[in-house]
Every structure is written in C-alpha cells, then in structure tokens.
Amino acid sequence: MSHRVALCAGLLFAAAVITAPAAHADDWSKTYAVNGHADLHVQTDDGNVSVTSADQNEIYVHVTTTRYTIGSSGVSIEQNQNGNSIDIHVRTPHFHWGFWGSSGTIRVDVRVPRNLNLDVNTGDGNVSAEPVAGNIRIVTGDGNITANGLHGQIYLHSGDGRIESSSMDGALKVDTGDGHITIDGRFDSLQAQTGDGSIDASAAAGSKVADGWALHSGDGRITLRVPSDLNAELDAHTGDGSVSVDVPITVSGTLNGSSVRGKLNSGGGLLRISSGDGSIHIEKT
C-alpha cells in the first residue's frame, strides 16, 4: 500500500512539473540619438544595471525580465527625451511574486557615448559601469558597484554592498554602509567611507591632495598606497589598532602606535585617515 501511495505522489509531482508554465521572459529596447554632451538618468526599483560606452552619438537602452511581462500589468517603463537629456524609469509591478513564490528579475543594459553625465539609481540591484567621462552618480540601496575607467566628478554609494572601482581619474567620493571598498586611480580629491568594512586604496602618479582627502572605516582595516612624490599633511588615527607609515614622513605632531601626524614631502592638503577599530597602513604605490 505504501508503495502505491509513494508512486501516486511521484506521478502527481511529475505531472505538476510537466504542466508547470515556463518562466516568462520579456524585453524592451530603444535607441536615442544625441548631439554633444548628453545627460542620462536611469532608475529602477529592483534590478541590475550595466553601463558600457562606445564611440557613438546615441544611447541604447535594453531592458530584459524573467517571470515578468513588460506592459500595463507587469513591469512599466517610463521614458522621456528632451534634447540631449534622457530619463528612464523601470518600475516593478505592485504584486511581483511569480510561479511558486519566485520573484522575477530585471536587467537594464545601457550603451552610451564615452562623454556624458550619468545618474543611475537602483533600489536593490548591482551596478557595473565602464569608461565614461563626465559627472557620474551611481547609487544602489542594497547591491554591489563595480566601476572601471570613470573620469570626472564621481560619486558611488551602496547602502549595504561592496564597491570596487579601478582606473578612476578625477574627484572620487565613495561610501557604503556595510561593505568593503577597493579603489585605484589618479585622484584630485578622494573621499571613502564604510561603516563596517575595509578600505584598500591605491593612488596613481599625478594624484594631488588639493582639497583634502578623507578615508574612514567604523570597524575595518585601511590600506592606502601613495606615489613617492605626493605632497600632503597626514593625520592618521585609529581607536583600537595600529598605524604604520612606510613612506618618508616629517613628523610635526603626534607619533605613537595608534596616531601619526606629519608631512609627506613638502606638505600640502590634509590627508585624514581614521578607523574606529582597525589598523591603518600607508605604503608606496
């Protein structure tokens, strides 16, 4: 009898699998012609965003979904172009649970000219961006950010994710509530902050501490690599760790295991590094 019950249960399960509807996928795309320096704003409630660049005078946007349809009863796409300014807003449906409780996914792929102002905001997704020059702002509520080759005024923020940026050039500000930060590039200005993660930063030749740099972790290790000719006033302090400086420094104030103040080369703008509960290491690039 037990074998019959098991057999019936197995047949019912197989029938359910066979008759289950396939996961739905949908997509939408549009190309926008631009002339000169463009402004692009992309916002999505719950999706991943990827930005790449090319030598072109157009912006191409491609939205793909799984377990969502695109349209009035599913994912809505609001888009507007006013000259060289383009706004894209991708909204998830109010009820967004799919088959057997599985939620759908949204992905936004954007191909842009190499020079433009970029503003990306996603509530709960990862963002990747590759060589773009302009005013750049990337914000995610609960995802990771990966950026490469961004130039200009750059702001990267994650509420609870990792930030990795390489080959940056210009003024960079990054912060995350609870993630690790890895950055390298040539900086005119550098601000990096994490509530509960480590910071690993490398400044390339040509970097300048003009308007001041600040690196802070509430509860993590900080490593900063600087070129040998960087001019700065150093102020490094940790509440519960050690500070090590492996570059030439002229001590002008405090020098002990947890705090260092002094000049790098001829001095200059203020380079402030602080950690509430982690070690600080300053090394040569």
Predicted features, each with a name:
Residues 1-285:
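Intrinsically disordered, low-complexity terminal regions
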